[in-house]
Amino acid sequence: MTRENGEIRLVNETEIYCDAGVSLTKVCRFALEHSLSGLEFAFGIPGSVGGAVFMNAGAYGGEIKDVITKCEYMTADGTRGELNSQEMLLGYRTSVFNKNNCVITGAYFKLSKDSQDAVKERMNDFLSRRKAKQPLEFPSAGSTFKRPEGYFAGALIEQSGLKGFSVGGAQVSEKHAGFVINKNNATAKDVMDLVKYIQKKVKDDSGVDLEPEIRIFN
């Protein structure tokens, strides 16, 4: 869930703070406005800062762990705390928050000065690549599966003949098989049934286990 009125502010000349509910796209635009480089890779990634930290979001050679310095969190009993980047144990689509019951409330990013033109050019380049290859015209949670070692999830799904395959209103994108999209008022059950079917079909066809990149809450 994103909050477009959440706080984003400069901490110093090259560091910014943002509330966890702020959208990544808004943070990227704030960085551009202040001629700060480092978050261009995140421009166009759906979701919030908190979700990006939780999963160590990344694309095009960049990851949240490359720019985050610390985050603020709150435990189930209301206790507040901070973790530095090392303490967050950020890895491929994972963090320490995957294993505890904390809620991320804010994050600090250390960026670098660059010209607005250069930052904007990189942002637009990454967004153009996304538009060309990803189904941004439909709602989705982004890339559905983690990249299995030695393979690409989208290629395996396509090899199993599942491009365009639907369950209810959920569909394997015809543009990029690594995305499950909401094509027509999909329910959570539609999405989960489709994800499970994809996992079974790819396992049967290729012997590869696909692990969801999206976080599932029952």
Question: What do the PLM-derived regions correspond to, one by one?
Answer:
Residues 1-7, 54-85, 100-106:
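Structural signature of FAD isoalloxazine-binding scaffolds in flavoprotein oxidoreductases
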Residues 1-49:
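Anion-binding (especially nucleotide phosphate/pyrophosphate-binding) glycine-rich loop
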Residues 9, 40, 72, 214-215:
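Residues embedded in well-ordered beta-strands within globular domains across many folds
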Residues 15-19, 43-53, 88, 118-126:
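Short N-terminal helix-initiation segments at or just after the protein's N-terminus
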Residues 22, 45-52, 59-62, 143, ...:
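Gly/Ser/Thr-rich helix-start
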Residues 31-69, 75, 140:
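A gly/ser-rich beta-alpha-beta helix-loop segment of oxidoreductase catalytic cores
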